[in-house]
Amino acid sequence: MDEKFWEKICSLQENGEFEKIIKEIKKLPEDKLDMKLINVLSRAYINLEDFENALNTNLSFIGKAKEDVTNADIWLFSECGWICNEVRDFEQGLKYLLEAEKLGRDDEWLNTEIGQCLGKLDRVEEGLERLKKSLKLIEVEDTENIYKKIFIYSEIGYLYELLENSEEALKYFYIAKDLGRNDNWLHMHLWINLEKTIGKEEALKYFQNEIKTNDVNSSLWRSLGQIYMDVFANYEEAEKAFKNAFKYSLNGQYLYDRSRALMGLKKYKEAIEVLLESRKISEQEEELTDAEDIELAHCYIALKDRKNAEKYLEFVKEGIDNIHEEYIDEYKSTLAELENLINKL
């Protein structure tokens, strides 16, 4: 392809015009296609979340590269494996990844992907072998890549958790923490395994001590709030923790969490104020507001305010088109529950 063609493609990529990229490449004769074009076409589909066409694009070019067919096919099988994993078809994803391995690929990325697949397929011991191999490979290939190390240590910890080996799980989670991971996922998995090894009260003390030494850590405050709320039903302490989480990071999720604690305390008017603030942030960030709308409807139902309950019920109904197919039945059930409660007012 000439320089003018690639300038146009680059411009379309920068502007996020992926449908136009697809049209431009689809105009080309089949004998003009090469690995670069196939990769651009596949990525355009991926950016549009059209994973089926992305997969078919890669599969269609296997064995057709004009140069270095083996390495081209390794890349294509690897991409196919990754795409299948993205749509949670781990069995098929594993098959493609193993094809890439048969052709000679044996690096950290491939072993990590295979390890994840095996874990998702309940072949946990095999998954651990692959991920531990990844740790060895990364020390050779990319020893300074802390983010990859954090990910692999976290995955190993998670697989040990699946095996109910909390001591080993904690060992790897602590390493991920020491390397710099600081998020709700890690904190809650630490909680799960600490609870199993030392009990709820001692596990709670661990988090209380952590927050004493790092009291501006919004993620840690949120995790502590979840523990107070979901494990101990201590809504008062949970509300304080979520309030601190928002204080140190203006994340609307923390407001939503705080509203749930306030609802647990039956402080519905305060919960409404917090939910409206959370909803405003969601709108500003162009995110869905269905979670806030559902809880706002619940609050107004509790206050026997039918007019406002119906107002937010309508927002909940409008939001159904944005719900992923995987969660649609649960969403419809929530909608029916709200309608039933409002009809009883």
Predicted regions and their residues:
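Register position in tetratricopeptide repeats
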Residues: 14, 47, 86, 120, ...
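Residue-level recognition of tetratricopeptide repeat
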Residues: 10, 43, 82, 116, ...
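TPR-repeat structural position
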Residues: 18, 51, 90, 124, ...
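Flexible helix-coil transition and linker loops at the boundaries of alpha-helical arrays
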Residues: 26-32, 62-73, 102, 136-149, ...
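Start-of-helix register in tetratricopeptide repeats
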Residues: 3, 36, 71, 75, ...
